Amino acid sequence: MVQYAPFLLGKFSDPLLAIMVGCLSYYVYERKMGRPQGHHLHELIKKRWDDRK
């Protein structure tokens, strides 16, 4: 029988925490690298979302 590792915060809270930490770390990475105007993640997502409509 397989024994699962215990949860850090909870069954649903752990994945949400992982997503939040990942998004925050990518935000810090983008700020550190100094990406050119119009090439930030939120701008690219917004552009793709607007093209979809």
Swiss-Prot record:
Its membrane topology, per UniProt? Single-pass membrane protein
**TM ranges:** 7-29
The terms describing its cellular component in GO are: cytosol; membrane
Q: Single Gene Ontology BP term?
A: protein secretion
Which residues does UniProt call coiled coil?
none
UniProt-listed InterPro entries: NCE101 (IPR024242)
Has the keyword Calcium been applied to this entry?
A: no
Keywords in alphabetical order, please.
Membrane, Protein transport, Transmembrane, Transmembrane helix, Transport
Q: List localization entries.
A: Membrane
Q: Where does it mainly reside?
A: membrane
Relate the protein's function as given in its record.
Involved in a novel pathway of export of proteins that lack a cleavable signal sequence. May be part of the export machinery or may also be a substrate for non-classical export.
UniProt lists the family membership as follows: Belongs to the NCE101 family.
Give the protein name, as stated in the record.
Answer: Non-classical export protein 1
Annotated source species = Saccharomyces cerevisiae (strain ATCC 204508 / S288c)
Q: Taxonomic classification, please?
A: Eukaryota, Fungi, Dikarya, Ascomycota, Saccharomycotina
